[in-house]
From Swiss-Prot:
Part of the 50S ribosomal subunit; part of the 5S rRNA/L5/L18/L25 subcomplex. Contacts the 5S rRNA and the P site tRNA. Forms a bridge to the 30S subunit in the 70S ribosome. Disulfide bonds: none annotated. Keywords: Ribonucleoprotein, Ribosomal protein, RNA-binding, rRNA-binding, tRNA-binding. GO terms for cellular component: ribonucleoprotein complex; ribosome. One of its GO terms (biological process) is translation. The keyword Ribonucleoprotein applies. This is Large ribosomal subunit protein uL5. Belongs to the universal ribosomal protein uL5 family. One of its GO terms (molecular function) is rRNA binding. It comes from the Bacteria. It holds the Pfam family Ribosomal_L5_C. This is one of the proteins that bind and probably mediate the attachment of the 5S RNA into the large ribosomal subunit, where it forms part of the central protuberance. In the 70S ribosome it contacts protein S13 of the 30S subunit (bridge B1b), connecting the 2 subunits; this bridge is implicated in subunit movement. Contacts the P site tRNA; the 5S rRNA and some of its associated proteins might help stabilize positioning of ribosome-bound tRNAs.
């Protein structure tokens, strides 16, 4: 059973009851997932940007957007319009497929993994987690990478509070650390 199907059939009715909501449309849901990678060295090294674009496209299965500097900062040696990172926004089927792979395959492959921090919510029910290396994803092979780079993964939900967002992600299988 896919994560989307499990959400519709079991998670949604359970959250409706647990959060004591009156309408099925009030139940929080995942709206989008943003995978972002900032590359400080991309200003000097164009190959690192190309490698990052290829890796993120392989991991997410979607075209990558290059993020550019909004203004020049002399201290960082960047000019306006220079590429400084890349990002992917996932919605729909690809979003659910990525979330399922993240929860079931990627996170358990992290060394000394005890669960993700429950404190990484933003106050509006959205969750952000930082990944230190791209090797936790089974799509990336060790032989094809030139450097170990991390990424930020933001899960945007329709939840109004952090508690609603956490209960949604916990039902979906996100392994939260118990503090």
């Amino acid at each position: 059973m896919s994560l989307k199907q499990r959400y519709r059939e079991t998670i949604q009715p359970k959250l409706l009851k647990d959060l004591s909501l009156s309408n099925i449309h009030e139940v929080p849901k995942v709206l989008k997932i943003t995978v972002n990678r900032g590359l400080g060295e991309a200003a000097q090294n164009a190959k690192s940007l190309e490698a990052s674009i290829t890796e993120l496209a392989t991991i997410t299965g979607q075209k990558v957007v290059v993020t550019r500097a909004k203004k020049a900062i002399a201290g960082f040696k960047i000019r306006q319009g220079m590429p400084i990172g890349c990002a992917v926004t996932l919605r729909g089927e690809r979003m659910y497929a990525f979330l399922e792979r993240l929860i079931n395959l990627a996170l358990p492959r992290i060394r000394d993994f005890r669960g993700v921090s429950p404190k990484s919510f933003d106050g509006r029910g959205n969750y952000t987690l930082g990944v230190r290396e791209q090797l936790i994803f089974p799509e990336v092979s060790f032989d094809k990478i030139d450097a170990i780079r991390g990424m930020d993964i933001t899960i945007v939900t329709s939840a109004r509070t952090d508690e609603e967002g956490q209960s949604l992600l916990r039902e979906m299988g996100m392994p939260f650390r118990s503090n």
